[in-house]
C-alpha cells in the first residue's frame, strides 16, 4: 500500500506516534488510508450540506475496511462572484483546488481518495487532481438543487433572476415581480438546478466512469445520494485492492465519450475548458478539432434549462444520465466496453436504464438536432477556436451578421447594455477578459442575461475572449483564441466592423483587409496587467489560452 511509506518500519515510529494522536489504532495500521477530499463551505448553497456527506462517507469507508481522513479545499460560488472582481478568482480557483488536493494526497501517501465536489470549479479541480495524482479514486457530488417555482407553478432557476434584472432595467418587469423570483428561484441546497456548469460536469463524471449512475441528476436533498456514497466507498476499496487508477479509466476515448454526452445534453461551454484541462493532467494530447467530429455523430437528445424549462430533477425522473448514455451506446456513438469505478463496463452500469419520458429525453429518431449541442467555431477572428452552446440558440438562427460594438471590459459592456446603447443587429465584442487579460477569464452571465432580459436574445450576438456561465443562452460565443491580451485578432476589432457567424459551417469571420489589419497591429501595444500582485498576478503570467484548457504552465 502507498500508505506504508508513512506507517511501516522502525524509522516511521515518529510518524506512527502522530497518527496515533490523530486517532489511528494499532489494528488500523494494516488498513488502507483513504483521503476524503471535501469542499464543504457555508456560503455556497451547493456545498453547505457536504459536511453531512463527508460523515456518511467516513462511516462507509470504515465499514468497507478503510481508515478515512477528511480534508477540505477552497471554493468560489460563481453566482455570488458574478459581475465584479470576485469573478476573476473563479477559474483560477480551479488550479488552487487541484494543487491543494495533490499536496494533501501526496504528502500523506493516501491509498485512495473519496472526492466530494459539486459546483463549477470545484468538480473539475478535483477531477484534475485525481488524474494528476493517479491514486485510486471515486466521486460523489453534492447533487443539484430542486427547481424553484412561481406561485403559478412555473419552473425557476438562478438564470431566471439574472434575466429578471435585465427585464426590470428595460421596464418589462416590476420590482415586486423581480423580488418574487429572487425569493423563489433557489429553494434548497445543491448546485443550480439547470444544465449549467456544475451539473454538466457532475453528469460528465458518470460518462468518464469515475462516478456512479445518478451522480449528475439525483437532487441534493434526496436520501438516495447517501446510498451512492455507501456504494462508492465499497468500490473504492475494491479499486485499491485491484490497483485500478484514474488514468486506467480516463483515456483519449473516454474524453471523446465525455464530449458525446455533453453534446447530447447541450452542456455548458465551460465543459470544453475543463475537460481539456483534465485531459492535460492525464497527459492526453487532445486536439480541439475532435470536438466537432464528436458533434457530427451525436444527436441533441435532452434540452434542459437554460435551453428549456426542464430541470435536472426532471431529467432524473425521465431516466437520468444513465438512460442518455445507454441510448448513445446503443446507437454506436459511445464505446460501452470501457472500465469504470464499479469494476464493470460502462454499458453494464447503465443496462438497466430506460427513458421514461420522451418529452424530456428524446431518442435518436426524435432528437432536437442530428448534431450535438456544442460547437467549436474557427475563422480569422478565432484562428485557434471559439466555443458556442448551439443548443441554447434559437433554432431558427443559422447565421448572424452584424456591426461590432466594442468594449474592453465586462463592466463597460454591462453598463452600456443596461443604458440601452446596444441595438438590434449588433455584435457585442467584450475583450481583454481572457485567462491572461481578465485575468481569470470571467464569466459573462450578467451581460448575456441583460441582453435576454431586454428582449434582444435573437437580435444581438455577443463574442468574447472570456467565457460564459452554463446559464448563458443566445448567440454567445466565448473562449475566442488567441485572446486580446496575447495580441489575438479580437484585439484589433473596431466599432462598425462587420462580423459574420455561421453556425452550420462553424465559422466566425471578420471583414477586414490584410492591409488594414497590419495597420491596426502596428498601433497596438500589450496592455499593462490589471493586477500586479497576489495570486491573480502569478496566474496571469503562467496561464495558457482557452483552447488548451486555460491550464497553468511553468
From Swiss-Prot:
It comes from Shouchella clausii (strain KSM-K16) (Alkalihalobacillus clausii). Mg(2+) binds at residues 78, 120-121, 443. InterPro entries: Dihydro-acid_dehy_C, DihydroxyA_deHydtase, DiOHA_6PGluconate_deHydtase_CS, ILV_EDD_C, ILV_EDD_N, IlvD/EDD_N. Homodimer. One of its GO terms (biological process) is L-valine biosynthetic process. Functions in the biosynthesis of branched-chain amino acids. Catalyzes the dehydration of (2R,3R)-2,3-dihydroxy-3-methylpentanoate (2,3-dihydroxy-3-methylvalerate) into 2-oxo-3-methylpentanoate (2-oxo-3-methylvalerate) and of (2R)-2,3-dihydroxy-3-methylbutanoate (2,3-dihydroxyisovalerate) into 2-oxo-3-methylbutanoate (2-oxoisovalerate), the penultimate precursor to L-isoleucine and L-valine, respectively. NCBIfam families: ilvD, PRK00911.1. PANTHER family: D-XYLONATE DEHYDRATASE (PTHR43661), D-XYLONATE DEHYDRATASE YAGF-RELATED (PTHR43661:SF3). This is Dihydroxy-acid dehydratase. Keywords: 2Fe-2S, Amino-acid biosynthesis, Branched-chain amino acid biosynthesis, Iron, Iron-sulfur, Lyase, Magnesium, Metal-binding. It catalyses: (2R)-2,3-dihydroxy-3-methylbutanoate = 3-methyl-2-oxobutanoate + H2O; (2R,3R)-2,3-dihydroxy-3-methylpentanoate = (S)-3-methyl-2-oxopentanoate + H2O.
